[in-house]
């Protein structure tokens, strides 16, 4: 009898240890007993006005047993439409993150019909929320059942944080309110602080820059936003720091211009965060990374006049194996960029390798704000380019408003990213542009790979606001981003990730060897030293402290985000 009782006790202990509902080290998964029942999911659906869906990869209609010819043709036609993808819970803008990271599970629109369609990293359920209350309800549900929670607006994401296997998605795309304030007072007009900040705009979590710029154009305002029209204005872009392509030089980073957040935190509570109220959370959200501290349902930013703007383009083509192409043509464009900056004209440099034989195409875009005469920019170009202007194709000057230069609907991508920040001391050194060009030449690009810059410096260097971003941002000149084209197969993705981390990133950081600093929104998704690269250890420790306060159980975890090192790469199990 004693032996029986001992054996029974061992069985009970074994079942306790291995019972999925007791494995607090992992999120609950669909094959475990802790997973919500159909009745639980139905109750959630009823509580959020019927807005719960079961996302499937958008290409499932192109594969057996669900093949539908007409539906598949529509998916194939829309596959590269960024606006369409933004509206689909089962799609991402960067399709590399739709497929499994550890298996061949894919579901691609142009693969063979008989090839199985697998869920991959597309969430199993999505709450397509239409109100703040629905966000709160969905967060509480995820917390109650210990679900892997992912947050998605438009699906622009360089590290895969908007999707995840066995996950529950909160899809914020329909929270698209835009409210202009002639004089915004954080905390409301009856706030005890009574510190009003002038013109501003409050935007819902689902607002895209294309819509915000369009509304601003009607009223004559613009914000320091991105140049990609389908990027969400209130999500990961701004919470990661918010680097505009060229407006930052004049008005600072997007986070320099945030006045207030409205956030659903891990308890499901809706809180206001600004410089006076929940100031620690306000600090963390202005650069601490998206998907780490809560779900921002509304953000309020300063606005600026939608000024008339001139845009000029200089292009050049050559071969990467020709040293003079780098030391003369590319260095010449970078020298011109520096000279334009000295005249308060920001610019963007882009370079792409177009063939396996090493063909390179490069362009410098220059912006001159608050000017309406094309001749103003033409006269500026003359002394800057001098006799070297013969090397470049100079496009006609474009005259427009700032808001008109955003890309309204860029194509879908399959890419990995990396980035580095160049210091002002490096770029302004006598041979800075030449050294930059030579070190770019050393980066072994493949066809479809590219390099691009975003203009920092200017107002970004002059801001005194305290941010979580690495301190090097305040003495920066340019952000250089690396774009690596990736094939869809698992083996190709694995090779591309290794190549990016082990080969390309060290060469990218070596452009300015005085500092190794990166931008999380365009960072290596496998960055081994992300804490130091993105924030610096002092800021990172402060971010960790704030996260422990607001999200002690890590309901919100983003790949290479705050406290993500305590979890596996999918945020599913603690390590």
UniProtKB/Swiss-Prot annotation:
It catalyses: peniprequinolone + A = yaequinolone E + AH2. Its cofactor is FAD. Pathway: Secondary metabolite biosynthesis; Alkaloid biosynthesis; Mycotoxin biosynthesis. Residues 1-23 form the signal peptide. Its EC number is 1.1.99.-. Belongs to the oxygen-dependent FAD-linked oxidoreductase family. This is FAD-linked oxidoreductase asqF. It comes from Emericella nidulans (strain FGSC A4 / ATCC 38163 / CBS 112.46 / NRRL 194 / M139) (Aspergillus nidulans).
